[in-house]
């Protein structure tokens, strides 16, 4: 690694010294170790980098791209390499490139003479390098302390040592002239090369203003203080120079201004002078004009309609809000209302907002509801007394009289307000892709849904389906009670039709339903059911009376009086505990007289009586009498019935049985 560092240091010795001096002049200190590490990485991933170095900004941008690609492939690029690369890239931006080329005519006059003499003897490549010597500029020129200016001039401005003259002069307020109109005098060194110690020598002098690019004709001039209440820039305190213009990105006072965007400003200025307002479009602003301009003296000042452009950030926020949250989300509605009521939007502005924010299907919905709202508004304008002179072409921004931006900018305030109301109403009717707007009658509160969420869904559906505001309010108040769950209905019922005038009905309903469905509400309902406590103006108790004491609130089996009597009777009748298990059920230690079991320990059902008698034989009933059985062959020798019963009675188990009446008769 040591040989590699020494090799890199010897290979890029001159280029490294130039970079270090350049960065030091700009107030940035970079160690030689970090620069060598940077060029090691460059030599590894950018083998095309020239040994003598380069001042071309495109080459350093290419280095950054290739280092990023190497990082994506898994190669480790130290953080110090990225920092040093960014600093060097920023330092080389003022140098000559194809994108930011500077002509030779913009250089000082004395430099042009020497340059023209040398270009006759050298090639075109050497000439370009000479041009760079005069127009190159170090970055961050404010930091001028601890710098060897003689060494810096030899490296960056070698030809300036040949020039003779005084040092840089500070231009006072009275001598301020644009740098683009007159070249720098011969022998004058750029202000960025002069130490700031000269400024600190005389502390009693008032502060002076430096000259910066752009030239005076392209600099921003604040409007003067208006007599109609529009404040201008406050004047500078007495005894001080005017406020200096802020420095631009180019800090070299000898370099010409950047031409980036200047063509656009020239076109806009030209169009303003010619009266073409389409070149500087977007929301209209009304500014008062002095009495002498467009109005006679003594008359109130007239207003002038001017267009101001929407910011790109506003359009970007609209697009991202519609994409992430939907066109009718609370965020988008708030943002759209702020834009609609904060600007004087004409029909063309609404179309631009819708096209840039909505999808094609959503824009088609917006346009459809816009046209529908315009037709309804035109009917109202004609039916008004007196009729309002606002037609459909004006509200849509079409037709011969209202198709251009300049024509729409002159619309009256009443038409602007109607366009705003129609477009906001059309925006509210936009549906998200794949979703259909339900009927307000089908929106019902869930059993566990909070009441405010239910009301919000109901209002959203009603706003999309009902156009009239008064009818929408009545429907929402009605459905907020009818479609609520039973718990919320019971809480709202005492308030229905009794809300005082001037109060919001929905707000009172939400207050009444606050806390329903929570743990506290459930505990209160349980306590109410047990004790009959008044809750919400209602008393919930058992419907019947106790058959024992006649009181309301409990049944007979739970009557405290009856339970107290039973305990007293049991204590008086039974003086001792039962000795063993119940002889009836065999399951518990209690007396048989107090046994209430329906089954015994084996699961057999128990009768209601305590003792049972002897089992009885079932009696046969029928239409035919019972005939005794006589074997065949003995039918004629049947003994009389009395003999049969006498033989039976002689048996020991039937000694005491009386004879039947039929046997006695025989």
Swiss-Prot record:
Family in the record: Belongs to the beta type-B retroviral Gag protein family. HERV class-II K(HML-2) gag subfamily.
Localization: Cell membrane
Misc: This Gag protein is encoded by a human specific provirus.
Molecular-function annotations in GO: nucleic acid binding; structural molecule activity; zinc ion binding
Positions with biased composition (Low complexity): 624-640
Source superkingdom: Eukaryota
Function as written in the Swiss-Prot or TrEMBL entry: The products of the Gag polyproteins of infectious retroviruses perform highly complex orchestrated tasks during the assembly, budding, maturation, and infection stages of the viral replication cycle. During viral assembly, the proteins form membrane associations and self-associations that ultimately result in budding of an immature virion from the infected cell. Gag precursors also function during viral assembly to selectively bind and package two plus strands of genomic RNA. Endogenous Gag proteins may have kept, lost or modified their original function during evolution.
Residues with a covalently attached lipid (N-myristoyl glycine): 2
Keyword terms of this UniProt record: Cell membrane, ERV, Lipoprotein, Membrane, Metal-binding, Myristate, Repeat, Transposable element, Zinc, Zinc-finger
UniProt membrane topology term: Lipid-anchor
Cellular-component GO terms for this entry: plasma membrane
InterPro entries: B_retro_matrix, B_retro_matrix_sf, Gag_p24_C, Primate_lentivir_Gag_pol-like, Retrov_capsid_C, Retrov_capsid_N, Retrovr_matrix, Znf_CCHC
Record Pfam families: Gag_p10, Gag_p24, Gag_p24_C, zf-CCHC, zf-CCHC_5
Biased composition (Polar residues): 604-622
GO biological process, one term: viral translational frameshifting
Protein name (Swiss-Prot/TrEMBL): Endogenous retrovirus group K member 24 Gag polyprotein
Domain notes from UniProt: HERV-K Gag polyprotein contains regions homologous to the matrix (MA), capsid (CA) and nucleocapsid (NC) proteins from infectious retroviruses. Evidence suggests that HERV-K(HML-2) Gag polyprotein can be cleaved into mature MA, CA and NC under certain circumstances. However, the exact boundaries as well as the size of processed Gag proteins have not been precisely determined yet.
Post-translational modification: Myristoylation is essential for retroviral assembly. Alteration of the glycine residue leads to a block in the budding of particles and an accumulation of Gag inside the cell.
Gene symbol of the encoding locus: ERVK-24
Zn finger (CCHC-type) location: 544-561, 580-597
Pro residues composition-biased segments: 232-247
Main subcellular location: membrane
Organism taxonomic ancestry: Eukaryota, Metazoa, Chordata, Craniata, Vertebrata
Region (Disordered): 165-264, 598-641
């Amino acid at each position: 690694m040591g040989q590699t560092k020494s090799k890199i240091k010897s290979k890029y010795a001159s280029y490294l010294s130039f970079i270090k001096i350049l960065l030091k002049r700009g107030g940035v200190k970079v160690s030689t170790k970090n620069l060598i590490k940077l060029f090691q990485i460059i030599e590894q991933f950018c083998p095309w980098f020239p040994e003598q170095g380069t001042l071309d900004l495109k080459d350093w941008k290419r280095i950054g791209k290739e280092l990023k690609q190497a990082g994506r492939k898994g190669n480790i690029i130290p953080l110090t390499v990225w920092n040093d690369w960014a600093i060097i890239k920023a330092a080389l931006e003022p140098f000559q490139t194809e994108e930011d080329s500077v002509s030779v005519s913009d250089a000082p006059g004395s430099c042009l003479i020497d340059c023209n003499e040398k270009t006759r003897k050298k090639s075109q490549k050497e000439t370009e390098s000479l041009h760079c010597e005069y127009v190159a500029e170090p970055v961050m020129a404010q930091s001028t302390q601890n710098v060897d200016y003689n060494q810096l001039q030899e490296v960056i401005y070698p030809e300036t040592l040949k020039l003779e003259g005084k040092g840089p002069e500070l231009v006072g307020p009275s001598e301020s002239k644009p740098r683009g109109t007159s070249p720098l005098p011969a022998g004058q060194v750029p202000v960025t090369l002069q130490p700031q110690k000269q400024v600190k020598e005389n502390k009693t002098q008032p502060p002076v203003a430096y000259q910066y690019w752009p030239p005076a004709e392209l600099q921003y001039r604040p409007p003067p203080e208006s007599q109609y209440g529009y404040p201008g820039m406050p004047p500078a305190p007495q005894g001080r120079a005017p406020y200096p213009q802020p420095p631009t990105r180019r800090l070299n006072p000898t370099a010409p201004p950047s031409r980036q965007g200047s063509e656009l400003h020239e076109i806009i200025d030209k169009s303003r002078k010619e009266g073409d307002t389409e070149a500087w479009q977007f929301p209209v602003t009304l500014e008062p004009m002095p009495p002498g301009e467009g109005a006679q003296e003594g008359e109130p000042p007239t207003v002038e309609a001017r267009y101001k452009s929407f910011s790109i950030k506003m359009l970007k926020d609209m697009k991202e809000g519609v994409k992430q949250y939907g066109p009718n989300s609370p965020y988008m509605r708030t943002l759209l209302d702020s834009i609609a009521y904060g600007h004087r939007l004409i029909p063309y502005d609404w179309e631009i907002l819708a096209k840039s924010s909505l999808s094609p299907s959503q824009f088609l919905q917006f346009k459809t509801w816009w046209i529908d709202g315009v037709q309804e508004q035109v009917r109202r304008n004609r039916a008004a007394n007196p009729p309002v002179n606002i037609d459909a072409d004006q509200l849509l921004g079409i037709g011969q009289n209202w198709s251009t931006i300049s024509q729409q900018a002159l619309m009256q305030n009443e038409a602007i307000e109607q366009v705003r109301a129609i477009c906001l109403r059309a925006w509210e009717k936009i549906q998200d892709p794949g979703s259909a707007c339900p009927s307000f009658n089908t929106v019902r509160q869930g059993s566990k849904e909070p009441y405010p969420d239910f009301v919000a869904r109901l209002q959203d559906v009603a706003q999309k389906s009902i156009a009239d505001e008064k009818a929408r309010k009545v429907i929402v108040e009605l459905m907020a009670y009818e479609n609520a769950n039973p718990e919320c209905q019971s809480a709202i019922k005492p308030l229905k039709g009794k809300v005082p005038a001037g109060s919001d009905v929905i707000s009172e309903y939400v207050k009444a339903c606050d806390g329903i469905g929570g743990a506290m509400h459930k505990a209160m309902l349980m306590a109410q059911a047990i004790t009959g406590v008044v809750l919400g103006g209602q008393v919930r108790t058992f419907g019947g009376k106790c058959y024992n004491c006649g009181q309301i609130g409990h049944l007979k089996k739970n009557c405290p009086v009856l339970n107290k009597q039973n305990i007293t009777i049991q204590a008086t009748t039974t003086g001792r505990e039962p000795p063993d298990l119940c002889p009836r059920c065999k399951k518990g230690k209690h007396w048989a007289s107090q046994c209430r079991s329906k089954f015994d320990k084996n699961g057999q059902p128990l009768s209601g009586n305590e003792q049972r008698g002897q089992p009885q034989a079932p009696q046969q009933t029928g239409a035919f009498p019972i005939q005794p059985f006589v074997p065949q062959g003995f039918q004629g020798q049947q003994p009389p019935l009395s003999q049969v019963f006498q033989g039976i009675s002689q048996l020991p188990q039937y000694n005491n049985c009386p004879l039947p009446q039929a046997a006695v008769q025989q």
